Amino acid sequence: GMLAKYLLNEEKPNDLKSMVRRYLPEYGDYEKQDKFDKIPWDKKELDPLCHYGCQDTDYTLRLMLFFEKKLIDLGLYNTYRNLIMTASRVLTSVEKNGLYVDRAFNQELLDSYLPKIEAAKEAIYNLPKVKKFTKLYNQSKIEKYIAKLEEEIENLDPRVDKRKIQSREQKIANIRAGVFTTKKELELIRPVSLGSSVDLPQLMYSEEGFNFEVIKKNDSGKPSTDEETLTNLRLTVKKPDSPKAVFLDSLLELRGLEKMYKTYIEGWHEKTQDDDRLHGRFLIHGTTSGRLSSAEPNAQQIPKTSVDPNIKKQLVAPKGTLYIASDFSQAELRIMAHLSGDETYLNAFNSGQDPHLAIAATKYHVPYEEALKIYEDENHPDHKIWKVRRKQAKQIAFGLIYGIGNKLLAVKLSDPKAGIIVTPEEAQKEMDIFFGQHPKLKTFLKKQEKFLRKNGYLVSLFGRKRRLPQIYSSDRGEEAYALRLALNFPCQSAASDMCLFGSILIYYLMRQGKLPPTKSVCLVHDANYQITKPENINTWSIYEMWQIYRNPLTKPYFGFQIDDVTMAMDFVIGRSMAEELPFIPGYDYRKMLEPDFSVEG
């Protein structure tokens, strides 16, 4: 019932009681069960417990019958049956299989990361500006503390409170002599707390500190110190080696280390169960876009190997098995090319060109082969220029797909450490140039906007609907948000569902014995991580999976088939999630489990 309701209306809540209240109002007395819910299970009486269970079952069935009719009437039943329900079974299997954790290596990281964090803090404390501020800041705290003690002395009666007066006078003398003994006194001379909502804003925004401009405030009205603010402030600093730039770079690095430790090292240590596995939750109904989401852990946000290989290295294949990771490449762009009919992207994808480099070459009126030659030659004087051009073409394309505005695109296009700062106005100009180069994409967007304004929702290739009442809002910001999703939703949703449906087909073919046995342990919107015995990894099995993923047979189930571009899929093999060795046809993967195996060999 919950999944049916999600397909009918992707907005929350999706829990049973909320759905009964909304769709079965004649059973309003069900709300009285809220009090019963608060009683611990071992304290509930049997008779009301049986009645409660029967009500749950009855209302679940009534809701399902109600939703089923709605799904049929709205033409969503095929999507529900062939995608949502089958995906639910597959994801239940993924959750049960779990991600195997190398506990010994996890413990190594627990021991080694804290010194890294402390070293990063120490580097910030040793910055001249921070040292100077800390001295002034602590002196100010000391003076306030002494003033408080002196005020207390004045309010004491010398005839009655002689010992109290002497005690406070001694404290003042000790502090002025640089002797701090109590916990409260030691707080007066500690380093600035880089995680404090009091200390850090003072360091960043006061005249005694770095005196940054306040560009954002938090909910309590105080200057913000969140990651987005730090990143945007960094874009305002032109010189990469200036004190402000060094401070912001160092603080962002510290935040990254702390997040890695708390989420992926300490967090996984606490969540790993007795079977040495992380059994996360994979949710079909967790996003409004239709993309898969996950929690405990959030598989979508596991850092890439290039960021820190040690994080994925904790996730190993169980003894006697290997990872097969099947990873979609540029799926959203391929869907965008199909939906819009954009020849530049279609030609690049179908000819095997690098699409981002092809777009950059078109923009700068350089033949693709010449641009590719420069891009691949690290010794060419223009190599770095073309690296930046390709990266910016990629950021613009994905920025449009992800529905970001010119401010966030400016952040994406900038590289402060390399001295590249892009303003929102410049980012907007780049977006306009991009649309000028891709008129069919602009035409597709106008069609989407027209449909959205008429109907109040968008529809994906797989039949999902995204309801956007914001399109009718008098608030221009809300209307702009809905318009950005006119490209974002159909591309993101269909790309995720292509991966999901391909994974469903592989799961059922494997269960029917038509593919070698594998266990999917992690499924995200653009990748499927499976474990299997090495003898199951061969040219035939990989080719069969590749054929399914590149163009799953969608016509019989959803009424469409993409015929002008195929999906691109990379297969990598490894003993852990961090080891990403490209599949080699004909290789005997049993060798990877031999004690003397090395990647270099």
Describe the predicted segments one by one.
Residues G1-G601:
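Conserved catalytic core of nucleotide polymerization and phosphodiester-bond processing enzymes
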